């Protein structure tokens, strides 16, 4: 039997994959993917599941049909680490921190962590993957509850409900102080048009509000279907009377609401956040409230939870605050308990988990052979989606694998998953892997098709090149379009290094590392020198340059690899070169 391979030796942590011996999943002989194999436990062979925070009774009852359930609440870290070595699964909400020390203390027995809710900020995913522990969540059951809470905060804020309630309970009768604003005819900008955002939009429409939304990857027809207008981020925040945040917390959205964005808003705007605390720069919001740019804010989530006792934002008279109650309805908590219980039980049985957020198991030999192609597939997906004009909505992706191998000798499921990961994960809080990629793509309305191009020659390399096309979208870089109008990028592995070899109709030779500037230009002498000079003057290190052209003296595309992101001023200088017709900066 082949030995298990430490993932860190062949993949970066972002790939979120672990391996299993080849005898468990021999290629082309068994297509089922074994996620977890439950070891023998006490209690007549039943696994043991530890629940550390209150879970709906329906979920507990479901767990007890399959496992021995230990409900131990308010455990210290030391107590949790002591108990965990006797448990096969752990179920938590947001209050239990599941860090590396917990996985180390489990001594390899802990196989599944279930998060009763959506966010997994309190679980160390890297450590979970390293220790071979699957992490699942319950992302759907609390959608309606979160949307209802968002609307409740919206209306309570507009009519000063919390402040008026506190006043009358203090024995006062000050009606004039709490004159509110009407919602009818006002513009609500919903930032993030996922499940919760779209439900908030539906309800706001019912209140007579004009609803606009910004989500760069939401299809416009999906928004139109419920009477919502899809607009740019700048239009959304500058025209809204109310803003409701429904964004995942990612590197791109962290502190998205800051001094700069507040300055772009209407004076007197009102903001609701039932998403993630970190999307708002809380110090900047406090300044915006004090200056009157933001008239009121209604917050259910905070950067640090619970907030400190004397938190100025919570105490501000224009802020309505609740202690992370978005999912706190009896119905939602029962639904979440059932959803997480089903996911944990299924994982312990070795079934596929559509809500897995870190790591399925795949054959060792497949990982070894496809390692550079996995990186190539993800980078091509990431590059292609950055070429899409915001608001176009990605709904049709085609992946082509050119190979001299027979179709049944090339397992592309992992590559397909990584293309999806590259396209969706940068703009989502969802972690994409082999298990949940198709599920997430379908959920977001993205249709993925694949085709094989059989080449003549030796099957020494599993794949000669991979092509990713995105159809029915507008491109930020017109030269990336194929003859049929699709965004098209193509790449291959050269000496173990993933490389970009084609953009649209133009051939290039670009190592897919760092970042790249693509420029379309008139093919004439001196262009490389002009661009290199601008970058050098701004201390931007150039790692490579490549030029592809249709014919001498006609159009050409130049690809410039850079180690860091140039400033806007630097990019403008490049764009101002007369012979350059268009350019785009892409993070790889």
UniProtKB/Swiss-Prot annotation:
Identify the PANTHER family for this entry.
Answer: D-3-PHOSPHOGLYCERATE DEHYDROGENASE 3, CHLOROPLASTIC, FORMATE DEHYDROGENASE 1
Q: Which InterPro entries match?
A: ACT-like_dom_sf, ACT_dom, Ado_hCys_hydrolase_NAD-bd, ASB_dom_sf, D-isomer_2_OHA_DH_cat_dom, D-isomer_DH_CS, D-isomer_DH_CS1, D-isomer_DH_NAD-bd
Segment annotated as transit peptide: 1-38
Q: Name all ACT domain ranges.
A: 516-588
Activity regulation information from UniProt: Partially inhibited by 1 mM serine.
Entries under CDD domains matching the protein: ACT_3PGDH-xct, PGDH_4
- Provide the phenotype resulting from gene inactivation: No visible phenotype.
Q: Which family does it belong to?
A: Belongs to the D-isomer specific 2-hydroxyacid dehydrogenase family.
The processes (GO biological process) annotated in the record are: L-serine biosynthetic process; photosynthetic acclimation
Q: Which reaction does it catalyse?
A: (2R)-3-phosphoglycerate + NAD(+) = 3-phosphooxypyruvate + NADH + H(+)
Which EC class, in a word?
Answer: oxidoreductase
Q: Where in the cell is it found?
A: Plastid, Chloroplast
State the source organism's domain of life. Answer: Eukaryota
Q: Which residues of this UniProt protein bind NAD(+)?
A: 195-196, 215, 274-276, 300, 324-327
What does the UniProt function comment say about this protein?
A: Involved in the plastidial phosphorylated pathway of serine biosynthesis (PPSB).
Q: Tell me what induces its expression.
A: Up-regulated in the aerial parts by dark treatment. Not regulated by high CO(2) levels.
What are the EC numbers?
1.1.1.95
Q: Which GO terms describe its molecular function?
A: NAD binding; NADH dehydrogenase activity; phosphoglycerate dehydrogenase activity
- Name the residues annotated as catalytic in the UniProt entry: 276, 305, 324
Annotated SMART domains: AdoHcyase_NAD
Name of this protein: D-3-phosphoglycerate dehydrogenase 3, chloroplastic
């Amino acid at each position: 039997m082949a030995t298990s391979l430490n993932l860190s030796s062949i993949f970066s942590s972002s790939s979120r994959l672990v391996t299993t011996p080849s005898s468990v999943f021999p290629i082309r002989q068994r297509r089922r993917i074994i996620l977890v194999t439950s070891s023998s436990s006490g209690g007549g062979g039943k696994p043991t599941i530890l629940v550390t925070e209150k879970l709906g009774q329906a979920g507990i009852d479901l767990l007890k049909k399959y496992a021995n359930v230990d409900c131990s609440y308010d455990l210290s870290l030391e107590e949790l680490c002591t108990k965990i070595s006797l448990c096969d699964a752990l179920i938590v909400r947001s209050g239990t921190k599941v860090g590396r020390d917990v996985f180390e203390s489990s001594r390899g027995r802990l196989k599944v962590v279930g998060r009763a809710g959506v966010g997994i900020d309190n679980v160390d995913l890297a450590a979970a993957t390293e220790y071979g522990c699957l992490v699942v969540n319950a992302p759907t059951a609390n959608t309606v509850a979160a949307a209802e809470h968002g609307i409740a905060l919206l209306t309570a804020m507009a009519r000063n409900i919390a402040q008026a309630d506190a006043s009358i309970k203090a024995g006062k009768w000050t009606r004039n102080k709490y004159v509110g604003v009407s919602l009818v005819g006002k513009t609500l900008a919903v930032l993030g048009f996922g499940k919760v955002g779209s439900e908030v939009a539906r309800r706001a429409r019912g209140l007579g509000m004009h609803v606009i939304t910004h989500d760069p990857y939401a299809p416009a027809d999906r928004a139109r279907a419920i009477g919502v207008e899809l607009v740019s981020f700048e239009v959304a925040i500058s025209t809204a009377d109310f803003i409701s945040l429904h964004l995942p917390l990612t590197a791109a959205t962290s502190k998205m609401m800051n001094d700069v964005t507040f300055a772009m808003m209407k004076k007197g705007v009102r903001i609701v956040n039932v998403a993630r605390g970190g999307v708002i720069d809380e110090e900047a919001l406090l300044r915006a409230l004090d200056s009157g740019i933001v008239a009121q804010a209604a917050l259910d989530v905070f950067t640090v939870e619970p907030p400190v006792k004397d938190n100025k934002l919570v105490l501000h008279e224009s802020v309505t605050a609740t202690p992370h109650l978005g999912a706190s309805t009896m119905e939602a908590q029962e639904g979440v308990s059932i959803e997480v219980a089903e996911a944990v039980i299924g994982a312990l049985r070795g079934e596929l988990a559509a809500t897995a957020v870190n790591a399925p198991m795949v054959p060792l030999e497949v990982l070894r052979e496809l390692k550079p192609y996995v990186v190539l597939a993800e980078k091509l997906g990431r590059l292609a989606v950055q070429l899409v004009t915001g608001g176009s909505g990605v709904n049709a992706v085609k992946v082509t694998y050119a190979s001299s191998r027979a179709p049944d000798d090339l397992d592309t499921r992992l590559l397909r998953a990584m293309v999806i990961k590259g396209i969706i994960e940068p703009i989502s809080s969802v972690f994409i892997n082999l298990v949940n990629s198709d599920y997430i793509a379908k959920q977001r309305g993205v249709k993925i098709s694949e085709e094989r191009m059989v080449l003549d020659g030796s099957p020494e390399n599993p794949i000669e090149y991979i092509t990713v096309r995105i159809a029915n979208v507008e491109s930020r870089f017109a030269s990336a379009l194929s003859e049929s109008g699709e965004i098209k990028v193509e790449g291959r592995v050269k000496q173990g290094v993933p490389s970009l070899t084609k953009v649209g109709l133009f051939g290039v030779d670009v190592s897919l590392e760092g970042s790249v500037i693509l420029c379309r230009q008139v093919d004439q002498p001196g262009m490389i020198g002009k661009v290199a000079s601008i970058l050098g003057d701004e201390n931007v290190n150039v790692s490579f340059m490549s030029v592809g052209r249709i014919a001498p003296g006609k159009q050409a595309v130049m690809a410039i690899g850079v180690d860091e992101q140039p400033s806007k001023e630097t990019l403008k200088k490049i764009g101002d070169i007369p012979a350059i017709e268009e350019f785009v900066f892409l993070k790889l």
